Curated annotation (Swiss-Prot):
It catalyses: L-histidinol phosphate + 2-oxoglutarate = 3-(imidazol-4-yl)-2-oxopropyl phosphate + L-glutamate. It is an enzyme of class 2 (transferase). Pathway: Amino-acid biosynthesis; L-histidine biosynthesis; L-histidine from 5-phospho-alpha-D-ribose 1-diphosphate: step 7/9. Homodimer. The modification N6-(pyridoxal phosphate)lysine is found at residue 208. The keyword Ion transport does not apply. GO terms for biological process: L-histidine biosynthetic process. HAMAP family: HisC_aminotrans_2. GO terms for molecular function: histidinol-phosphate transaminase activity; pyridoxal phosphate binding. This is Histidinol-phosphate aminotransferase. Keywords: Amino-acid biosynthesis, Aminotransferase, Histidine biosynthesis, Pyridoxal phosphate, Transferase. Its EC number is 2.6.1.9.
Length: 356
């Protein structure tokens, strides 16, 4: 028998393009357009390379303590992983045993079903409404767990804290995992609900609002028992997943709250201005609470618009996927970058009108 017959085949996640050209306006992977805080830069400058000969802390205890204090939690309620993708992967493996289907929106982060296929976890996609809103009542059914990105990606839309609490109250025998990768851009975090629900696990990241996508740091918050189980699984794979420099950078990123709030506020302001300009141009735009917008134009095919923008050295994100194939996701960059996009779209639409 050929060894290929024993392979476990999955369709891997396809990440956004990282173009080699440096003159592109890169708006396809939701990176923060602003640099990390000066505190982070100082840690990098002061880091002694001789320390790299030593293994890092196995549980990132100082970073966990800093996060616990920031969010008014106990240290044993905090888990640190190598990016939120690893945290999500380990969470699926830890909390969803595969006996019953887990529930997730049909339009959401495309890594979720891949984890299910990889770990042989049955899952059921719950359709969003035509306007991409989520009905909490759809999650009041038997399940092996629930996974919801809030705010959602790629739609950018958020559900309220009250709606999350309703889901938790009606699913107290299942883990409810809320992925808050974009929470700092306008959503309402459900971390306060950890006091009431031991079946809640909240995942966040340093990549977006903290401008640290390059160092790969992710977080899970939950009950002490849930986090202990998560560490048991993590340590069964790798007891040293977070390097020493990343741990120090993570700590430093939470010491400059003024810079953090200023950076996030700038992105939100730019997003709202960009949304308004798109609407003036005839685009349909969802009510984004993230650092991106999800857009559709009734007169322009999204595939065509994606290619036209790319040729103009503006790279955005498009999925050839049911229900959203005629939509584009556009990361919020600097004011200058977004103004460039608007001016290009104005010119493109004007020329298109002339050709009719």
């Amino acid at each position: 028998m050929s060894w290929q017959n024993n392979l476990h085949s999955v369709s891997p996640y396809i990440a956004g393009e990282q173009p080699e050209l440096t003159d592109m306006i890169k708006l396809n992977t939701n990176e923060n357009p602003y640099q990390p805080s000066l505190q982070v830069q100082k840690v990098i400058e002061d880091f002694k390379s001789e320390n790299l000969r030593l293994y890092p802390s196995t549980d990132a205890k100082f970073l966990r303590k800093a996060l616990a204090e920031y969010h008014h939690l106990n240290t044993d309620q905090v888990f640190i992983g190598n990016g939120s993708d690893e945290v999500l992967s380990l969470s699926f493996l830890t909390f969803f045993n595969g006996q019953r289907a887990i529930l997730m929106p049909d339009i959401s982060y495309s890594f979720y079903p891949i984890y299910c296929e990889l770990y042989r976890i049955p899952y059921q996609k719950i359709p969003l409404a035509d306007d991409f809103s989520l009905s909490v009542n759809s999650y009041f059914q038997e399940n092996g767990g629930i996974v919801i990105a809030n705010p959602n990606a790629p739609t950018g839309m958020a559900i309220s804290l009250q709606e999350i609490e309703e889901i938790l109250q009606n699913n107290q025998d299942s883990i409810v995992l809320i992925d808050e990768a974009y929470i700092d851009f306008g959503g309402e975090s459900c971390l306060p609900l950890l006091e009431k629900f031991d079946n809640l696990v909240v995942v966040q990241t340093f990549s977006k609002s903290r401008s640290l996508a390059g160092i790969r740091l992710g977080i899970a918050f939950g009950s002490a028992e849930a986090i202990a189980h998560l560490y048991d699984v993590k340590n069964s794979f790798n007891s040293y997943p977070i390097d020493s420099l990343a741990q120090k950078i993570g700590e430093a990123s939470f010491t400059d709250e003024t810079y953090f709030q200023k950076s996030v506020s700038k992105i939100i302001t730019t997003r709202e201005n960009f949304k308004n300009e798109l609407i003036k141009l005839g685009f349909q735009v969802t009510d984004s609470k993230t650092n991106f917008v999800f857009v559709h134009h009734p007169k322009i095919d999204a595939t065509t618009l994606f290619k036209v923008l790319y040729e103009a050295k503006i790279i955005v994100r498009h999925w050839n996927q049911a229900r959203i194939s005629d939509w584009l996701r556009i990361t919020i960059g600097t004011d200058r970058e977004m103004n460039t996009v608007i001016q290009f779209l104005k010119e493109y639409l004007k020329n298109k009108e002339k050709s009719y």
